[in-house]
């Protein structure tokens, strides 16, 4: 009986396992909130308050003065927080009722309640949270909710 080639489908798992890193280098949270109140999404102070609460609750450390830009009605705001653990970026699109958050952290952290916080503070109708473990390819993506 001939040997199965290494690139055969039945050997794909073995190849991925052998090549996969054995260490996690933190995580990434990709959060999309939709059906949000458009006026709230234009408020830089509200968006900064949400970001500051995420940072405080997860005990992250901000480096420098976080840049932010208000695009002006009908558009939203963008804010970027450089963290000693990586970064937090937020972009709002009031014309679509959408806010997007991206938090990358080089260490494991507690879980922040994105769902209820964004529903309460941005009047989000839907919040989608995706968590990726960085560096751990075998567990590259975890859907937290839809």
What are these regions (language model features)?
Residues 1-146:
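Polybasic/polar functional segments that serve as interface/processing modules
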């Amino acid at each position: 009986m001939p040997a199965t080639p290494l690139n055969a489908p039945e050997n794909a798992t073995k190849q991925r396992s052998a090549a996969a890193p054995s260490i996690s280098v933190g995580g990434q949270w990709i959060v999309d909130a939709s059906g949000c109140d458009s006026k709230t999404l234009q408020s830089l102070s509200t968006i900064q308050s949400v970001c500051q609460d995420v940072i405080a609750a997860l005990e992250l450390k901000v480096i420098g003065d976080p840049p932010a830009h208000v695009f002006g009605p009908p558009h939203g705001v963008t804010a970027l927080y450089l963290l000693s653990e990586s970064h937090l970026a937020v972009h709002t699109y009031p014309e679509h009722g959408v806010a997007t958050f991206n938090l990358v952290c080089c260490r494991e952290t507690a879980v922040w309640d994105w769902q209820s916080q964004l529903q309460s503070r941005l009047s989000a109708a839907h919040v989608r949270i995706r968590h990726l473990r960085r560096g751990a390819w075998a567990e590259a993506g975890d859907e937290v909710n839809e």
